[in-house]
Structure formats: C-alpha cells, structure tokens
Amino acid sequence: MLQAAGGYSIDMKFWWHIEWPEEIRRRTFLHLRNNKDGRLISINVLEYAGIIITFVAATHYFLSNPRDTDLQPVARLVADNSASESWIVKACTRSAIGRALGRVQCALMINNPVGLDCDHVCSKDNKVADGLSRIEHASNAASYFSSLKQRYPELAGCRRFRPSSKLISIITAAICQQKLVDPVAKSQQLLSDLGRTIL
C-alpha cells in the first residue's frame, strides 16, 4: 500500500490498481523514518484513499448497471485499517490529510444515488486486495492479475476499473498538499467522470 493501491469486488465484478506518484511514495515510511517535519504520509491516509477509489468503482458499477428494484444502492466495502474505516463513517478530525480526503469523499457523495458503508475485515482475510496493492509497476498489473485469478478463481469474471485522471489528481493534491476542495463545486465534475472499466 505504500507504493501502490488496489481493490476489488467480486459482486460488482471489478478490480483496480494504481501506483502512487513519486511525490507520495517519497513521503511514506519507505523513505522517511519519522514525522518530525510533518511530511510523513501515513498508511491510514493511503488506506482511506484506497477506500474512496473503491467507492468510486462501486458507484461506476451501480450507475452503469441500474436496478429497478434498488434505486438507492449501498456500496458495502470492507477494509483492514480501523482508522480509515472510522474516517469513512465519522470523518477524520486529527489528520489534515485525512480531512482533505474527507472533502473528496463528500464531493463524491453529494447527489450520488449510491450510499457508502464500511465493515472490517482481518488482514489475513484481505489477501486479494493486499495482492493488488503490491504490484510493483502498472505495466505488470495485467499479468499479475492473471496470476491472482489462478490463485483466486472467483476473480475470473472481474474487469479492470481505471479511475479518472481528474479523480487521481484531486486525491493526490489532497494527500500531498492537503488541498481542501469545495465538495459542492467538485461534486458534479467528479461524478460525471468517475473512470472506466476495461477488459
């Protein structure tokens, strides 16, 4: 999770993977030993960003596959990081980066018919998402995912979701610059270009 992030849903038939930009990786525990200068980007922040991206993929799924019987679906996501799980439901109060990401989450939820809920999963039961987070380079993602499908056959029907460049840019700015977006102003822009699913 310190170099890349990934997530999936068997029910919604998607998986995703992104490499964190160098400006984020340089500020993780891979390169900084402490937070004396306030520059460290914690794993909690990266896990929270990952949940937000998974919510975006879930929103894309529900908007692309509307159901007459469920006009207000809820994406029930699971995570193995208690801080990020709490931030999804209650918002972050201490971390400036967490608060900035909270505004991105807000922007994605305004006028969105898809709700969000989060449950806990033990790290030992989160092997697929952890595997997607450990792909070293995006160019290796397809072949690595093929090997994951061999280990976890339930992934066979999943397609790759690519978050929009605008979303990744806003998330990166929130993480690196603690940039606070105006949720009302950004909502329609983000919801109109969530990303796309590819084979």
What positions do the PLM features span?
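A cross-taxonomic marker for long C-terminal extensions/tails that follow the last structured domain
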Residues: 146-199
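RNase H catalytic domain
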Residues: 55-134
